[in-house]
Regions:
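Extracytoplasmic/periplasmic, Sec-exported soluble proteins
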Residues: 21-25, 71-74, 99, 158
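Active-site nucleophilic cysteine motif
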Residues: 21-38
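Alpha-helix C-terminal capping segments
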Residues: 11, 19, 108-110
Length: 178
């Protein structure tokens, strides 16, 4: 099984920056990095999901909020998938009415508070593959095809300290933005 750390290293390669969103959307980017890092179906072919909602529902061994990931693993694991999920009942035109939310976007957490993704969002002022803050995402998932080798290495007080640091940084960012 491919290590999630290696998967994150592959995702962070500058060679992906040449792709525009129309060439490689968010799902396509994650799937290309899976393939480029050596992850294959048992028959040797590449994984091909029906979008970020399909990834959210069926490609993960664990999922939760960013705070839950930090509490469980002591940190955000490199190679984790970062999602933007809204609680609007699902993407109904694709048959997702299970109440698990609408995963409208997916990227790859590469460490250092950064996510690699493909977007055409004006908020990021780019069209295609690039990097942005984990703070633009609200949910985390661990892909069942990757080896995260994660364990909670922090005790309760260390976890509280990490969460307090994150809250303080978010507060500082809000003050700057407002």
């Amino acid at each position: 099984m491919v290590s999630a750390a290696y998967f994150a290293e592959v995702a962070d390669r500058p060679e992906y920056d040449k792709y525009k969103y129309e060439q490689l959307d968010c799902q396509g980017f994650v799937e290309k990095v899976l393939y480029d890092s050596g992850v294959r179906k048992p028959d040797g072919s590449r994984y091909n999901r029906r979008g970020s909602n399909s990834m959210w529902r069926s490609a993960l061994s664990w999922r939760g909020t960013i705070a839950e990931a930090v509490q469980k693993f002591g940190t955000l694991p490199a190679g984790a998938w970062a999602f933007i999920v809204t609680d609007d009942g699902g993407e109904k035109d694709r048959g997702y009415t299970d109440g698990e939310g609408n995963a409208s976007h997916v990227g790859i957490y590469v460490g250092g508070g950064m996510v690699r993704d493909s977007t055409r969002s004006t908020k990021t002022k780019r069209d295609g593959v690039g990097s942005r803050s984990i703070n633009d995402f609200n949910m985390i998932g661990l892909c069942k095809y990757l080896d995260y080798d994660v364990q909670n290495v922090n005790n309760k007080s260390q976890i509280k300290s990490i969460l307090d640091d994150i809250e303080n940084k978010l507060r500082e960012l809000r003050e700057v933005l407002l």
